[in-house]
Curated annotation (Swiss-Prot):
EC number: 3.1.2.28
Protein name from the UniProt record: 1,4-dihydroxy-2-naphthoyl-CoA hydrolase
Residues the record marks as active site: D13
Catalytic activity reported: 1,4-dihydroxy-2-naphthoyl-CoA + H2O = 1,4-dihydroxy-2-naphthoate + CoA + H(+)
Organism: Crocosphaera subtropica (strain ATCC 51142 / BH68)
GO function term, MF aspect, one: fatty acyl-CoA hydrolase activity
GO biological process: phylloquinone biosynthetic process
Recorded metabolic or biological pathway in which this protein acts: Cofactor biosynthesis; phylloquinone biosynthesis; Quinol/quinone metabolism; 1,4-dihydroxy-2-naphthoate biosynthesis; 1,4-dihydroxy-2-naphthoate from chorismate: step 7/7
Family: Belongs to the 4-hydroxybenzoyl-CoA thioesterase family. DHNA-CoA hydrolase subfamily.
Function: Catalyzes the hydrolysis of 1,4-dihydroxy-2-naphthoyl-CoA (DHNA-CoA) to 1,4-dihydroxy-2-naphthoate (DHNA), a reaction involved in phylloquinone (vitamin K1) biosynthesis.
Amino acid sequence: MTYNRTIHFSDTDAAGVVYFAAFLSICHEAYENSLQVAGIDLKTFFTSSDIAIPIVHADIDFYQPLFCGDRIQINLTPTQLNETEFEIKYQVFNENNLDKLIAKATTKHVSINPKIRQRTSLSLSITQWLRSNQDDC
């Protein structure tokens, strides 16, 4: 799954490069977009009282700076780890050079019952989303 985006001024820090926390937000945008493309209603997904899917780990590696106005392509690859967890790997390229990796990130997600804060199986819609995106890879 790919997601294309322009780096905005609000994504940058005082040095004029993308701020690391803003980059995680951009990755989350790509994740949300992939859910929406798969037919998952985002409002229902993020406000469900039965299941929550928090991010429990995130990491980023930058290989060159990103500036306001840069056009990027994010390739995301979700992988189910077990019945309650999945991770998403993000690879970021400049749209003008898709051969050179600019940055990479990983987010790990865990399905929980928000009422009792215990792990629960991934929902059918997320399992289907994971399978459909793994078939693309």
